[in-house]
A protein has these predicted regions:
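A short, flexible loop at the N-terminus of ABC-type nucleotide-binding domains that lies
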Residues: 1-4, 9-23, 28
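ABC-family P-loop ATPase nucleotide-binding domains
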Residues: 11, 70-123, 127-128
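ABC ATPase nucleotide-binding domain signature region
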Residues: 31-32, 43-93, 172-182
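Catalytic Walker B motif of ABC-type/P-loop ATPase nucleotide-binding domains
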Residues: 132-136, 141
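H-loop/switch region of ABC-family ATPase nucleotide-binding domains
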Residues: 164-165
Length: 183
């Protein structure tokens, strides 16, 4: 089942005009990449799809469980401690495939930004969401971590939304793209 936005309008408080105006868009199963210049509304659109923001007008039909991985790698996932205690096959597989040590969730604040980002994605995937929304997932990670991340994201079978300036990732992961311009 897709995420469907119908005639959505959104403006931040004190804005002189809406950032998003009368947008209708369907995020189908598979990966949709959001492209556009900085400040054009990609992250805002992703947050609307995730349910972190609500539109002033229009409707959004969301899936039962949507996982959000923010651009800020230092934002610890809500289920981080649950993942730290989990040793089910999926948790073990994600730790192995993303080269995450068992103690890393317990020392999240001391990890590098790249390790934090991998943990954000691992926790999100471990929760088996219907939709996964990622904002700049390859920022702060090295080439090997990027490859690991791509491999686990390619296995995701739900509705995926990817905000990124990483053209190679977009080309390898994206099934479709939505391009945005400011104004």
């Amino acid at each position: 089942m897709p995420i469907v936005l119908s005639d959505v309008t959104f403006a931040y408080p004190r804005a002189t005009k809406p950032l998003i105006h009368n947008l209708s868009l369907t995020f189908a199963i598979g990966w949709t990449c959001l492209l556009g210049d900085n400040g054009c509304g990609k992250t805002t659109l992703a947050k609307l799809a995730a349910g972190l923001l609500e539109p002033q007008q229009g409707t959004i039909q969301r899936l039962d469980y949507v996982a959000w991985c923010p651009q800020d790698p230092q934002q610890a996932p809500e289920a981080l401690l649950d993942f730290a205690c989990a040793y089910d096959p999926l948790a073990r597989s994600l730790r192995s495939r993303l080269a995450l040590q068992d103690d890393m969730p317990w020392r999240f604040a001391q990890l590098s930004c790249g390790e934090q980002k991998k943990l954000q994605v691992a926790v999100a995937l471990w929760q088996q969401p219907d939709a996964l929304i990622l904002d700049e997932p390859t920022n702060h990670i090295d080439h090997q971590a990027r490859r690991q991340l791509l491999e686990v994201l390619q296995q995701f079978k739900g509705t995926g939304i990817l905000v990124s300036h990483d053209r190679q990732l977009l080309g390898l992961l994206g099934n479709r793209c939505a391009c945005f311009e400011q104004g």
